[in-house]
Amino acid sequence: VDLMEKNTKQMLQLVNQILDFRKIQNGKMRLHVSLFNLNEMVDSFEKEFRVMAEENEVSFTFQLAGEDIMVWADKEKVAIVIRNIISNAFKFTPAGGNIYVTMGVSDDDRHCYVRVEDSGVGIPQSKLSEIFERFSQADNARGAYYQGTGIGLALSKEIISLHHGEIYAESPEGKGAVFTIELQLGKEHYKPSEVDFYMGGETVSVPEAESVSASAGKESEESDFATDDDDDF
């Protein structure tokens, strides 16, 4: 029963990823951007993956930021990306290995980051530029661990790009891999032509970038952004 539930969950996840990827390709992906605590999200993943770490006999270390990191982003979509990256680290790290998750804010306070490092086999340098492409597979000694559609990393890159952020991988071959997710702080980077501002259950048009910046002082209020597209695809 557990195996059946696991396979069903994986299949559903794959279907959802394919649908999301198609929405992005067609320019129909909606972002529901709200202000949330990135520390709390990352901390929830520590609890979620702790059991897996024990089952796989992998050392799992989390280092949260010293202060709360409040970020304007699509919470659900960002969670998908972070979960994908941590899941990959477990997938490619053998028993006795190590996985480190760290986060923080850049020195210039312009963006925040979540970094996932593993001690697995790593990724060939020739493949680093390809792993974020759809259906890409890394070809190395543990190639069996890289089988699959490859859509997870491709979807992750597209989601982060919609947020005007970056995601990239580094890997000294044979020494594991490091994936870094960067999100800009604030909300001025969201284009007014692409964003609607939700406040108090009402939709307010944001025609100018200054309007977005001016509302930054209200970040403590419950607010949302959404791209100005419908959900159809």
Residue ranges and their predicted role:
Residues 22-33:
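Helix-loop junction within the histidine kinase core
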Residues 89-90:
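Short helix-loop "hinge" at the ATP-lid/N-box region of the Bergerat-fold HATPase_c
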Residues 164-170:
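Glycine-rich ATP-binding loops of the HATPase_c
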Residues 6-11:
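Short alpha-helical segment of the dimerization/phosphotransfer core of two-component systems
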